[in-house]
């Protein structure tokens, strides 16, 4: 695990305060999210799946999703819609808004032609805001070859043979 990138204390504090005002959370929710933002590896803060996060911190799916939606609203995270190839774990596109998604695409990795199905090949993910913590995955030109091809370009919910992505 690499050394965590620095945190903008002011923005983190403001965001957590706004998040705490958004609704009443269980007592451990905001301290656990703060710990996650401060100490997680850069890759763990890139394209976070709120359901997976919730299972790690004993938070229901509904509460985990609500936490990340509110966290995006207050600027702690940014929400993205990822278009995933149906045949490999390639992220074919990352969109802030669904109206940018085209009905058909060709995968740059496996060359397969894909018809977009919103319920099957779209993932909603959250990445820590660059103002809060500027992770290396926001700078793909600085990634190692392995990180660029196997972590940046692939969905972290897929796998490539024996290599977990």
Regions found by a protein language model. Give the residues of each.
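Amphipathic alpha-helical "recognition" segments
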Residues: 70, 82-86, 98
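Cys/His-rich microdomains that often coordinate metals
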Residues: 91-93, 113-114
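Residues immediately within or flanking Cys/His clusters that coordinate Zn2+
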Residues: 50, 80-85, 104
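N-terminal alpha-helical interaction blocks
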Residues: 2-76
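Short cysteine-rich clusters marking metal-coordination/redox-active sites
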Residues: 83-89, 107-110
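Long, charge-rich boundary regions
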Residues: 115-165
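Cysteine-rich micro-motifs
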Residues: 100-113
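Basic, alpha-helical nucleic-acid-binding regions used in initiation and control of genome expression
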Residues: 87, 91, 97-98, 102
